[in-house]
Amino acid sequence: FEDSKKTFVYDISEDAWHYRASYDENNRLTFWRYSHVTFAYGKQYVGTTGVLAYMDEKKFTEHDDRVILKMRRGAVVTSNDQPFWIDHLRLICNNGQTSLDNSYTNLELNPRVSFRYSWDGATWSDYEDSYMGRVGNYEWETDLWQCGLGRYFTLEVSTTEPIPFCIQNLQISWSPTSMF
């Protein structure tokens, strides 16, 4: 749907729909620019204007090295509709993971991950950046502190770094409150 600037894709391996996007020449997020997809010779081929490329699980940019946004938005977290305070979040991910081809860019040496959150589902906080740890530092902790107070909390985690990104778990430290 080029007019809506969104592309929805059904992933057979995940048995779920998901949203794909590309950055345009002005670095704005827009619809996924690959409009033709086919599976042949053991590869998933994609086409866009004047280009035939294939999807590679070990490449984390598009065919012309534009970054790929990897984003996950969680479900709403609530405490029985009562207000609560989030003191601390810890993202459990592939901290300190090495590059798949043993070549390291400056970004891969300490890749950045961005958080933003919403307490009402409509307005979002500013992005807050954290890091995933230098290569080999598997004990690195990716944390977000003092997320605020509310009744309904939604978290979004994203990165555009050219690395594998796998969220394994999220720990939330929260406290009930009688404020409001």
Give each language-model segment a name:
Residues 1-180:
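Beta-sheet repeat architectures centered on beta-propellers
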